[in-house]
Amino acid sequence: MYGNYLDDAAKIVAAKREENLKFEHARLTAEQKDDLLLKFHPDRIKKQFTELKIGPNKGQQAPIELAEMLQAKPRLEPEKIDLNHIDYETDVLVIGGGGAGTSAAIMASEAGAKVLLVTKLRVGDANTMMAEGGIQAADKPNDSPAQHYLDAFGGGHFDGKPELVYTLVNKAPSVIKWLNDLGVEFDKMPDGTMVTTHGGGTSRKRMHACKDYSGAEIMRTLRDETFNRADQITVVDFTAAIEIIKNEKGEAAGAVLMNIETGEIRIAKAKVVIIATGGAGRMHYQGFPTSNHYGATADGLVIAYRAGAKLLYQDSLQYHPTGAAYPTQILGKLVTEKVRSLGAKLINKDGEVYIHPLETRDVNASGIIREVREGRGVHNDVQDAVWLDTPMIDMIHGEGTILKSIPAMYNMFIKYGIDIRKEPILVYPTLHYQNGGVEIDKTCHTNVAYLLVAGEASGGVHGTNRLMGNSLLDVVVFGREAGIEAGKMFKKIKLSDNLSLKHVKDFEKERTAAKIKGNAVSPKILPTYHHGNPEFEKEIPGATL
């Protein structure tokens, strides 16, 4: 029970549940989708974006908050950094300890490389751990990578780089087998066949899941495998990369590292550098809550951009349609799309089903925003929202389905007295995914030599909208590809003796010439929740070095 004014609002949903269960809302036409996105999607609000004045993407648009970080003062002063004092020397430097970073480290070590994995929090503190619904792969008789390609490419508004989408879908079946062999406990039938379900925008049931703990289970397995390779993979945690180091040829040759607890600086020299730092939800674009982990602050984009790497679709973000909108304690937390794939429908305050629950994420997010703005949302003290009618799931599939299939969702709400088996829940879009990022090719190369990028920090895989289940797939497919590529490269590259931060000095000159204003410092490293108290800006040691 909600135990307040929302109980009466929930009764309207309950009264129409049987009727709504039988009602199937028509899919929107292409024209209807375009109109809805144009009017209500946050990415279409021009005043929330600004033109980049410096860097490889000069003249292009970016969210105001991201532009500030991309063009901010560097956290270090190059002349104060001693590049002759090397703390770590390695074949492959992996920056980031999520699904992409660990996959890359594992595959590079498989090729015989000595790997240094640095992460500003701990291995596994990543958006991979937060993912719930599942991972896509076309490995059933009625499906194919070609069909998966059509869904993913179309779902991304045909903006994805074809070679990246091709790699994503064709590597998917082998990635599922690899994860299964490593020990990921996928949902299976009694005969061992993997259970698959639909997601928004999928034409076939190809979603493989581990109940609704899919990301956590995959991350657990990758983390264990990483630590099991301690003879080849050295992990340094609570350490952020704050600048890429180059050599005299302009090739990536390592990174400046900073311990986030002490501010201590360390220099890592490497033959190949892989950025796998994840997303940017903790930038809270346009004030949206986020489903992202605490360290998602766009650091990888900042250090890559300053090193000269081009970005792609940096102006495209994904707002997951169903973030928790009540109670306050879980505002913005992800309500997995699996809830809708199991049959729960989106309902407005009048008890009406106003959209198909499995439209693509950008369309459903826009639909929720429309309902709220036009007065058909449910008013509450936390965030005006719409209902997600979860009791429909047990009605469709039988009592006990919720506890069996989405226990994480049940546990998240029951601690606040809301039983999703009996009561609907309130949802509103939450900042969930960075569609764009550093532009890569199919083997994760950027335009900066020896600098690879994988996972959510990259751009081009999903175009300008991502389908459910393709992010977990992305981090493993391209994390592996980056590791495999680095495993080939390191054997042909010599460690450089001429390390340089000249590109940082050049960036400062460009910044001065463009008359960039403000005192922001980047990379951000951790979000700042100072509630108006600027003293909290000093919480990271060595704010400038």
Give each language-model segment a name:
Residues 1-15, 21, 309-419, 485-492:
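An anion/pyrophosphate-binding glycine-rich loop and adjacent beta-alpha core
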Residues 92-95, 267-278, 452:
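Short hydrophobic core segments
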Residues 53-67, 242-258, 405-458:
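A glycine-rich dinucleotide-binding beta-alpha-beta segment and adjacent secondary-structure elements
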Residues 137-168:
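Glycine-rich active-site loop/strand segments that organize a redox cofactor
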Residues 41-44, 48-62, 69, 73, ...:
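Conserved redox-cofactor binding core of oxidoreductases
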Residues 272-329, 469-485:
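Glycine-rich loop(s) and the adjacent beta-strand/alpha-helix scaffold that form part
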Residues 1-2, 74-75, 80-90, 99, ...:
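Glycine- and aromatic-enriched mobile tails/lids
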Residues 1-91:
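Extreme N-terminal leader/targeting segments of oxidoreductases
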